[in-house]
Regions:
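Cysteine-dependent deubiquitinase/ubiquitin-like isopeptidase catalytic cores across multiple families
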Residues: 32, 38-40
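Acidic, Ser/Thr- and proline-rich intrinsically disordered linker/docking segments
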Residues: 2-31, 45-50, 66-177
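Polybasic phosphoinositide-binding surfaces of eukaryotic membrane-targeting domains
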Residues: 50-64
Length: 177
């Protein structure tokens, strides 16, 4: 296949996905929005947005083509679980904190590639450096924790979901580790 993209991660992922016309269209959109130090791990065909499209997994985001020049974005840092359901059709269930994102129409091959990409991301996140200098100190984390607790006690009408989101957002903040 001739080289279409200047970013080799996009080029190689497109080739692995089969380089269909729709994958190429979404790949161009993904190529245009790549951030510094971001690279594409895999592409796969999907029918998730209600029509034939493609899904990309990068080292930072999952991107689904939802229209010409439009991508739905899910930060991989917010993904807490990835599951597959094979009946009645192959479906990818991506758990984002307390919500599920369902991706339909991947096919077995696409599902395997997307799972492989997520497994790589998990393995990289699990292999944290032995020594890290967090942006903020333990005292800062404690103070933010107290602020969240104070807010929850001063606002008893806050729903459990909102309270959980505030706590999860504070704990998941990568400045702490």
């Amino acid at each position: 296949m001739e080289q279409t993209f200047s970013d080799m991660s996009v080029q190689m992922a497109v080739e692995r996905a089969g380089a269909s016309e729709l994958v190429m269209m979404v790949a161009k959109d993904v190529h245009d929005v790549l951030r510094p130090n971001e690279f594409v791990l895999e592409f796969a065909d999907t029918t998730s947005p209600g029509f034939h499209s493609a899904l990309a997994v990068t080292n930072y985001r999952m991107l689904i083509g939802v229209g010409p020049g439009q991508l739905q974005e899910i930060a991989v840092d917010s993904v807490t679980r990835v599951d597959a359901v094979r009946a009645p059709e192959v479906t990818l269930l991506v758990r984002v904190y307390n919500a599920d994102v369902t991706v339909y129409g991947l096919g077995d091959r696409g599902l395997r590639r997307i799972f492989h990409a997520f497994n790589w991301i998990v393995s990289q996140n699990a292999a944290r450096p032995a020594h890290a200098d967090p942006e903020n100190s333990i005292a800062d984390m404690y103070n933010e924790w107290i602020d969240v607790q104070r807010f929850l006690h001063e606002n008893p009408d806050v729903s459990d979901e909102e309270g959980n989101q505030r706590l999860a957002g504070m704990v998941a903040n990568k400045r702490w580790w």
